[in-house]
Amino acid sequence: MSQLGHRYLMESDEESVRLDLKTDTDAVEKQALWAGIEPGMRVADLGCGAGKTTFVLNQLVGPAGSAVGVDMSPQRLDYAESHYSHAGIEYVCKDIREPLNDLGMFDFVWLRFVLEYYRHESFDIVKNISKILKPGGILCLIDLDCNCLRHFGLSERLEKYLIEIMEIMENKFNFDPYAGIKLYAHLFDLDYQDIAVNLTPHNLIYGELKETDNYNWTKKVEMAAKTSGCRFQDYEDGYEGFFKEFLDFFSDHRRFTYTPLISCRGRKPVAD
């Protein structure tokens, strides 16, 4: 997802493909059903990226429902239109930090893997998108905790620099490695009702490395390391040495990696 006046940390010519490949449609369906999506609903997928999730949500609401995918990146939306167009789906280019009233009202609003890019504005974004949700409608927030930080089998040196990279991203680039742990508080502070929380592993990687995990993590670490400006002084060849050690670690079948995924859903209060 890219937003006006906000640097999207993963931006590259290959980002639409990365988002497409990493999206597990079975997981999206399971999460949406858990949150309470139903046939006939009008759904907003905010930060829709490549459109794959919007397509799944539209299938779940069926022909009596509809889905609007919203993203600020024209490149993502072009990809979505080319790969995930369908009757009942509309893609719109908008900044979710700005008023969204012209989109109309929705029964179900979905925000997945977006707040991690807005450490300082996350609550304001949730408050803003809540305005397009009908009273009694469902808001579903999904994000990661300890993002990119839970590994076993790596050297102390590699672990040190992975932590340093994420600290730089957090302090200088508004990235939030701990976005998931805050989701419940966002809904609680907006007086949402029937709040439910689910905790599952998002990445659970051990043994032989899947090609999709290899591609996704390679791109994530490459982009974060380069963007951070970290000097990697403990490596004779700097970034190249760091990146090679990460690739060697990640391809080792002994390696164990996971990322906690926190899903939170609630119903918007019905006015008296």
Q: Which positions does each model-derived feature cover?
A:
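Conserved catalytic/acceptor-binding region of the Class I
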Residues: 140-209
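Class I SAM-dependent methyltransferase SAM/SAH-binding core
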Residues: 44, 50-99, 124
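A short acidic, Gly/Pro-enriched loop at the edge of an enzyme's catalytic core
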Residues: 100-109
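Core SAM-dependent methyltransferase catalytic element
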Residues: 190-191, 261-272
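Conserved alpha-helix/loop element of class I SAM-dependent methyltransferases that forms part
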Residues: 22-41, 56
